[in-house]
């Protein structure tokens, strides 16, 4: 494999899990065989990576003897293999659509392992959640009324959380302000078919400080609910645990050195995901629990004293290092004396950050199909998909390849399991949907593919 950089000294090589690095360095011919058989782009998934990530988070919580509930945010990708890995490792699933719920049920999840989030649940979604007694996060007073209306007269108690919209999130359409939470509690006071289990929030961004502030607001509402005669036992902090895609120092150097001319658009994107996070998800969670909550108590101390379960729905954080996306190069086209465009078999719908006016700030890895007989000059290029859309660009960054790519070579993007590999995938131009497989090692440690479908995983 060949790593490259955008500017000498300011490249962004991805952090690679050993299994991924071994596939690229030791089993290159196997990778080409898989691409030949299954097409490009090809999404490869490692369920054991999710289990490792889950164990790291659970370790932080069990070390503090905190009651907890971790639900894998299934919306992060479409992999049943990762959903099954979460279930087999003791986690639950966060389902945000009727179809995610049905997949979870087909994988064997009962209602006790499911939480349903999202603001726009349909009556059909509500009904199937009620039928399996899944935990439902209620987004608004309007949703609460719809839910109550849909409950059978002889229904057992339906467990719910009320979704809080913290004060500093006033422009968000998700959740409800504290006074609306209290209004919902008053509505529930005479409704025996619904059990109020606690509060839920999910914030944009990755700052611990905003979570602590939201926890303080939630604590006040937990106290108010108990004064009203309820027995809440959970605070759910949603997701947003950061992960590390690239080395922090390299990332800072890259951001400091980038200039508008480094992009084919002549413009630096306004924002990026924090690819060079200083903390792993487990470290971030550790620091959140140690943060001061109130009256000199830490978050962990507050939860323990109040007898509260800490729930969360990590998506990206559990899918960290769990997938790669493999593109095959179809053509390298010269645009001028020192610039090229590299066309791949596939589209930016399978590496979709440019559709959000940003960039996936991880350098792709070039895996040559054959060894060049002569040393080819470096190539400066951006990456484009195979569609007729001018916007179908995988990377607007000018990338400098010290070894010139050729048709038939592979470009591998690492760590695409979180809202990247299949978030926008489709059959544009009637191309088939990209294939997705789980990578499982045999007894000799050799990687093998298993279809990433329900019934196979």
UniProtKB/Swiss-Prot annotation:
CDD domains: PLPDE_III_Y4yA_like. Its cofactor is pyridoxal 5'-phosphate. It comes from the Bacteria. Signal peptide: none annotated. Pfam families: Orn_Arg_deC_N (PF02784). GO terms for molecular function: diaminopimelate decarboxylase activity. Keywords: Plasmid, Pyridoxal phosphate. GO terms for biological process: lysine biosynthetic process via diaminopimelate. The modification N6-(pyridoxal phosphate)lysine is found at residue 75. InterPro entries: Ala_racemase/Decarboxylase_C, De-COase2_N, Orn/DAP/Arg_de-COase, PLP-binding_barrel, Y4yA-like. The keyword ATP-binding does not apply. This is Uncharacterized protein y4yA. It comes from Sinorhizobium fredii (strain NBRC 101917 / NGR234).
